[in-house]
Swiss-Prot record:
Top-level class of the enzyme under EC nomenclature: oxidoreductase
Membrane-protein topology: Peripheral membrane protein
Alphabetically ordered keywords of this record: Endoplasmic reticulum, Glycoprotein, Lipid metabolism, Membrane, Microsome, NAD, Oxidoreductase, Signal, Steroid metabolism
Chain residues that bind substrate: 164
PANTHER family: 17-BETA-HYDROXYSTEROID DEHYDROGENASE TYPE 6 (PTHR43313:SF4), SHORT-CHAIN DEHYDROGENASE/REDUCTASE FAMILY 9C (PTHR43313)
SUPFAM superfamilies: NAD(P)-binding Rossmann-fold domains
Protein species of origin: Bos taurus (Bovine)
Subcellular location(s) of the protein: Microsome membrane; Endoplasmic reticulum membrane
Annotated protein name in UniProt: 17-beta-hydroxysteroid dehydrogenase type 6
Leader sequence residues: 1-17
Single GO cellular component term: intracellular membrane-bounded organelle
Organism taxonomic ancestry: Eukaryota, Metazoa, Chordata, Craniata, Vertebrata
Example GO BP: retinol metabolic process
Main subcellular location of this protein, as a coarse class: membrane
Length: 317
């Protein structure tokens, strides 16, 4: 019985491996638009796809980021300034992309731009921070996608949305997790609604990686500032000892982030270039072998595993 199941499982993975190795033809004629290319995953993906021969259209927040990217890539790569929180910026970028791609349409749209404001417990964070994060990480994804969707549909192309393992299992960073759960839901709906148009939608769910968003020094400074601005009655509820212990816990986690960004960008590239892309990509060993399996456990068991090492607030019962 077990041998039979093992053989079936082996055949399944062999078939999946074979299907996923099939590459889309004429990649050199495909246009891919990527948001958030100033640094991090977006910057690396832009350079990676440029080396592969694709026609990369890179959305950057700053002219400095755009210039640095152009200096590191071939003449094929083009840049545009894009602020995903501004409707007029998205509209202008869409018109620019339309002119670039012509009648071919847009093969790939990668929604990568994001911010990371997860520097404390949920009630420490100001409501403005929740709004700002959702405006970039969720509303920005939705608005860019809806604006460029006709171009993607014309090419029967791909949409790749960068979520997070915190969009699969929420245990830290209420602000960020809320935005990424929204990206997951939006992507699932898009995938089902667009299947009849030949458009494929994938999500990439990275674990912990070292980028500008997870730089410990900057993270620590913001975290201390947030704690300083937290109302006194809330600070009394948790206590300074709790904050110090929580601060050290965050330090351990962020300093252990993976530096191999290719684990993420390779997933993005596969979603854009494979004939049979996956629906979800869990990027990083922590995501694949800890957080994703954890997400399938009973909630009470997952809660225990995740929080057993957390410090206790001063007024805990």
């Amino acid at each position: 019985m077990w041998l039979y199941l093992a053989v079936l499982l082996g055949l399944y993975y062999l078939l999946r491996w074979f299907r996923e190795r099939q590459v889309v033809s004429h990649l050199q004629d495909k246009f891919v638009f990527i948001t958030g290319c100033d640094s991090g995953f977006g910057n690396q993906l832009a350079r990676q796809l440029d080396l592969r021969g694709l026609r990369v259209l890179a959305g950057c927040l700053t002219e400095q980021g755009a210039e640095q990217l152009r200096n590191q890539t071939s003449d094929r790569l083009q840049t545009v300034i894009l602020d995903v929180t501004k409707t007029e910026s998205i509209a202008a970028a869409t018109e620019w992309v339309k002119e670039c791609v012509g009648d071919r349409g847009l093969w790939g749209l990668v929604n990568n731009a994001g911010i990371f404001h997860s520097h404390g417990y949920a009630e420490w964070i100001k409501i403005e921070t929740y709004r700002d994060t959702l405006r970039v990480n969720l509303i920005g994804v939705i608005e860019v996608t809806l604006s460029m969707l006709p171009l993607v549909r014309k090419a029967q192309g791909r949409i790749v949305n960068v979520s997070s393992i915190l969009g699969r299992i929420a245990f830290f960073g209420a602000v960020y997790s809320c935005s990424k759960y929204g990206v997951e839901a939006f992507s699932d709906i898009l995938r089902r609604e667009l299947q009849h148009f030949g458009v494929k939608v994938s999500m990439v769910e990275p674990g912990y990686f070292r980028t500008a968003m997870t730089d410990w020094q900057k993270f620590s400074e913001i975290m201390k500032q947030i704690w300083k601005e937290t109302p006194a009655h809330i600070k009394e509820t948790y206590g300074q000892k709790f904050f110090d212990a929580y601060h050290d816990l965050m330090k351990q986690g962020l300093l252990s982030c993976s530096t191999n960004l290719n684990l993420v960008t390779d997933c993005m590239e596969h979603a854009l270039t494979s004939v049979h892309p996956r629906t979800r990509y869990s990027a990083g060993w922590d995501a694949q072998f800890f957080f994703v399996p954890l997400s399938y456990l009973p909630t009470s068991l997952a809660d225990y595993i995740l929080t057993r090492s957390w410090p206790k607030p001063a007024q805990a019962v």
